[in-house]
């Protein structure tokens, strides 16, 4: 029998199917080549034209990263509700560890898009709160309006009663308004307003009782005589006082005029003396100028 021996250098190669990663790389490379723009006809061929560009390192997305992203996007804490937008207008709660239910420990500022959405939801919720009333709240509001109307009626009735009570007179006033049984004899008015009253009518024996005790006797007599004077005596006395005042003014004016004439004589003497001194000064200045001119002429001659 013949035995077939294999050479030591030869190796048996087995077929192995290509991996998914290599297939995906080939597909991406083909797409890049197809998407490249065609080169211009008149372009010059450079030394580095046929060199291949270095490929950027592709980031591999693992299944775990996909799960983390899906869990982060599906996290219910990131969804802004209308009720929460009232309390937190510009903040959104987020968890440090996505995928695990924990309490809200921190807050993240809203983006411009989420701010607009939150404002829209807030306006909608306020409209709903203002216009939509439940069936249980409507009867409560009606009851409240009825109670308010009853309270206002009670207050108005109390106010009317208080006004009526104020209008009614007190018993003391009623007694004072009652007629007196024996008012006595009527006292007739015999004097005019400008006439002096009788001391007997005023229950006074003498006007001296109205004056203080510190007043001297002479002054008391004068005051009593003035009080006993009639209207004519008052007017005559006033005219006498006015005449005396006019005489005093005349005397004061005369004395001021005399003083002004005296001052005028004194002032005229002073003015004459001042004029004489000024003339003397001018004469001295003229002499000094003449001396200066003579001195300058002598210096020029020398």
Swiss-Prot record:
Location (main, coarse): nucleus
Bias-annotated ranges (Basic and acidic residues): 56-67
Any one Gene Ontology BP term: cell wall organization
Location within or outside the cell: Nucleus
A Pfam family: ECM11
Gene Ontology CC annotations of this record: condensed nuclear chromosome; nucleus; synaptonemal complex
Biased composition (Polar residues): 35-46, 162-171
TM segment ranges: none
Region (Disordered), start-end ranges: 1-67, 162-187
Keyword field: Cell wall biogenesis/degradation, Nucleus
Its job: May be involved in cell wall organization and biogenesis.
Protein name in the entry: Protein ECM11
Naturally occurring in which organism (per UniProt): Saccharomyces cerevisiae (strain ATCC 204508 / S288c) (Baker's yeast)
Annotated gene: ECM11
């Amino acid at each position: 029998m013949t035995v077939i021996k294999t050479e030591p250098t030869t190796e048996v190669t087995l077929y192995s199917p290509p991996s998914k990663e290599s297939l995906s790389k080939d597909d991406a490379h083909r797409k890049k080549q197809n998407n490249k723009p065609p080169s211009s006809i008149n372009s010059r061929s450079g030394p580095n034209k046929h060199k291949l560009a270095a490929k950027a390192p592709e980031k591999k997305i693992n299944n775990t990263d996909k799960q983390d992203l899906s869990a982060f996007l599906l996290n219910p804490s990131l969804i802004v509700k209308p009720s929460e937008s009232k309390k937190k207008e510009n903040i959104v709660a987020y968890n440090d560890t996505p995928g695990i239910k924990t309490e809200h420990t921190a807050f993240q500022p809203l983006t411009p898009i989420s701010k607009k959405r939150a404002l829209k939801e807030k306006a909608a919720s306020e409209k709903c709160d203002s216009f939509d009333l439940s069936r249980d709240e409507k009867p409560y509001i009606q009851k409240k309006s009825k109670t308010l109307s009853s309270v206002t009626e009670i207050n108005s009735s109390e106010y009317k009663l208080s006004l009526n009570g104020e209008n009614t007179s007190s018993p003391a006033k009623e007694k004072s308004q009652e007629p007196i049984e024996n008012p006595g004899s009527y006292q007739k008015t015999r004097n005019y307003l400008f006439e002096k009253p009788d001391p007997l009518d005023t229950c006074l024996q003498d006007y001296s009782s109205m004056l203080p005790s510190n007043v001297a006797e002479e002054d008391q007599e004068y005051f009593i005589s003035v009080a006993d004077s009639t209207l004519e005596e008052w007017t005559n006395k006033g005219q006498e006082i006015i005449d005396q005042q006019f005489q005093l003014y005349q005397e004061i004016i005369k004395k001021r005029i005399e003083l002004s004439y005296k001052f005028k004589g004194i002032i005229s003497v002073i003015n004459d003396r001042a004029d004489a001194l000024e003339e003397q000064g001018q004469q001295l200045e003229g002499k000094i100028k003449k001396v200066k001119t003579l001195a300058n002429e002598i210096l020029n001659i020398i």
